[in-house]
Amino acid sequence: MNQTPKLNSFRAGPDEDGRFGIYGGRFVAETLMPLILDLQEEWEKAKNDPAFQAELKSLGTHYIGRPSPLYFAERLTAELGGAKIYFKREELNHTGSHKINNCIGQILLAKRMGKTRIIAETGAGQHGVASATVAARFGLPCVVYMGATDVERQAPNVFRMKLLGAEVIPVTAGSGTLKDAMNEALRDWVTNVDDTYYLIGTAAGPHPYPEMVRDFQAVIGTEAKQQMLEAEGRLPDLVIAAVGGGSNAIGIFHPFLDDESVKIVGVEAGGKGLQGDEHCASITAGSPGVLHGNRTYLLQDGDGQIKEGHSISAGLDYPGIGPEHSWLNDIGRAEYVPIMDHEALEAFQTLTRLEGIIPALEPSHALAEVIKRAPKMGKDEIILMNLSGRGDKDIFTVAKILGM
């Protein structure tokens, strides 16, 4: 899966308690602890089981369509006049994003554990669609919790999930977004621990989820590294990805962490600006706290109450971030920067116009940062960006904003 990291490696975490430095861990209700420990034990076995890995690889090839291509964005590179820009085309995967990589891995684990019901949370709907897809593929019932706000703004994905046989439950609590959906899913899990598997979509949650999701997503960076060596004979100077919970980002970052020549940048949702509360930049404007089973950077007020964030992109609309990202930020191995809604929207239009690729609003945030950085870099330098999802789900949102 991932080659074994060397000692003193940035890739060695988490420790046996699921911690990356002071982040991560397992902050869960007592009723869930036996289940979490059971999950960890099964995950350790599966990781080292050649049959599990072979099935995962086969489904990756024949069902997801891996490896995803590495694409040189020739016209975008020419327009910006600086570094060469490459995209890892995760939006070409089955279901249209990176989410399927993790879902296939986790459903194989659920089957292994004898679970007969799948639950999931979703923001943009991409993880919900991927969960409903793998549940259909393996003949298991699936319930997807989705914030009522997101149900409204991601209608095409809601329809897809229902077509795939999933039950979509709109969550009206809080601001009706991803955080609230995750709270409801955790409640369901506590109630139905015996037969239910909670398929978490991002690299957050209690240990072993952040590690497990990362390992299933690391196929992105592992492939990209190989493809980059084939295309350019060397590694990129900069690897960049959008960060909500952070699974697409950790998937492309992780295999490069020990390559000191490679700069790593995660792009957070700056929303309408960092002055107010209408953003989801947990690292840039948040502070460490505990949410959804792990310690990490969160958007919280002085009393530790979780704030309701905002982003034009439903998939980045989460008031926290995966614990490994928090650790990478604190040790200085990765840098995290915000991009505003309007910048992401401009980047979305630029890519569509120049390359004939309609990106999701999530990777449009990463693209906006690429557009800022590329002109300041030399023409002999290389940027690798994770194009984590396609924009079919966002065309109505964008059309509304642009008055089309």
Swiss-Prot record:
Cofactor or coenzyme needed: pyridoxal 5'-phosphate
Secreted keyword on record: no
Residues where N6-(pyridoxal phosphate)lysine is found: K99
EC number: 4.2.1.20
Metabolic or biological pathway: Amino-acid biosynthesis; L-tryptophan biosynthesis; L-tryptophan from chorismate: step 5/5
Superkingdom to which the source organism belongs: Bacteria
Swiss-Prot/TrEMBL keywords: Amino-acid biosynthesis, Aromatic amino acid biosynthesis, Lyase, Pyridoxal phosphate, Tryptophan biosynthesis
GO MF entries: tryptophan synthase activity
Catalytic reactions of this protein: (1S,2R)-1-C-(indol-3-yl)glycerol 3-phosphate + L-serine = D-glyceraldehyde 3-phosphate + L-tryptophan + H2O
Subunit structure: Tetramer of two alpha and two beta chains.
Name the record gives this protein: Tryptophan synthase beta chain
